Design a protein with these regions (language model features):
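Short glycine/proline-centered loop/turn elements that form peptide/ligand docking sites
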Residues: 25-26, 45-46, 66-69
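Sec/Tat signal peptide C-region and signal peptidase I cleavage site
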Residues: 16-20
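SH3/SH3-like beta-barrel superfamily modules
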Residues: 52-96
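Bacterial N-terminal signal peptides
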Residues: 7-15
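Short, structured beta-strand/loop micro-motifs enriched in basic residues and often containing a Trp
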Residues: 36-46
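Positively charged n-region of N-terminal signal peptides that target proteins for export
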Residues: 1-4
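Short, low-complexity, Pro/Ser/Thr/Gly-rich segments in the mature regions of secreted, periplasmic
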Residues: 93-105
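Short N-terminal segments immediately surrounding and downstream of signal-peptide cleavage
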Residues: 21-36
């Protein structure tokens, strides 16, 4: 019976972990307009990685994972706030410079 309970607990844990993350919408924000005024989209989550594209203020992105990794978020660039095609350029941005978009309004 104990082995059955452990197996059941393990199966329920795996089922919960298998849920898909659909992504959340964020917008580039908190940039210094007197500085470079762009957010670097990079090939990986580090400043040593190549810059793929420079994202300006108010650029919309969709996150690929629910949480940041060492402050970095993997994202897909959207063409507009209505673009949910997931077909945009993919890369990494520093999470401090993206703000969550509340879609409940």
């Amino acid at each position: 019976m104990r082995k059955f309970m452990i197996a059941l607990l393990g199966a329920s844990f795996l089922a919960g972990a298998a849920e898909a993350y659909d992504g959340e919408q964020f917008v580039v924000c908190k940039l210094n307009p007197l500085g470079d005024n762009f957010l670097a989209l990079r090939s990986c989550g580090s400043t040593s990685c190549d810059v793929i594209r420079k994202l300006g203020p108010d650029t919309f992105v969709i996150t690929m994972e629910p949480y940041a990794t060492n402050g970095w978020r993997e994202v897909i660039v959207q063409q507009s706030s209505q673009d949910w095609s997931y077909a945009g350029v993919k890369g990494w941005v520093y999470g401090k410079y993206i703000c969550h978009v509340d879609l409940s309004e």
